[in-house]
Amino acid sequence: MAVADINKSEVIKQFARGANDTGSPEVQVALLTTRINELTPHFKANMKDHHSRRGLLRMVSRRRRLLDYLKSNDADRYRALIEKLGLRK
């Protein structure tokens, strides 16, 4: 299930660093977090859906790599993003 276009554009507006920013780490992490949060109820209801779970784990891994990149290059932006998204660290 993909993120709805309206929801996606709202997330991009909220986390963009500029007017046409769609590729910054903040936007990418926010979009991945939105997709992960939308898929979580599916896996609670369908525990044996291992094929889709693999895709979820890829998204989580990709988000982790983007967060590591952001943390190594700009720790202040990293902390602000983690706080804004409500992630654990």
Curated annotation (Swiss-Prot):
PANTHER family under this entry? RIBOSOMAL PROTEIN S15, BACTERIAL AND ORGANELLAR, SMALL RIBOSOMAL SUBUNIT PROTEIN US15M
Q: Which UniProt keywords apply?
A: Ribonucleoprotein, Ribosomal protein, RNA-binding, rRNA-binding
Note the InterPro entries from the entry: Ribosomal_uS15 (IPR000589), Ribosomal_uS15_bac-type (IPR005290), uS15_NS1_RNA-bd_sf (IPR009068)
* A Pfam family the protein falls into: Ribosomal_S15
The encoding gene: rpsO
Question: Which GO cellular component terms are attached?
Answer: cytosolic small ribosomal subunit
Role played = One of the primary rRNA binding proteins, it binds directly to 16S rRNA where it helps nucleate assembly of the platform of the 30S subunit by binding and bridging several RNA helices of the 16S rRNA.
What is the name attached to this protein's record?
A: Small ribosomal subunit protein uS15
Q: Does the keyword Ribosomal protein apply?
A: yes
Give me any GO biological process, just one. translation
In this entry, which stretches build a coiled coil?
Answer: none
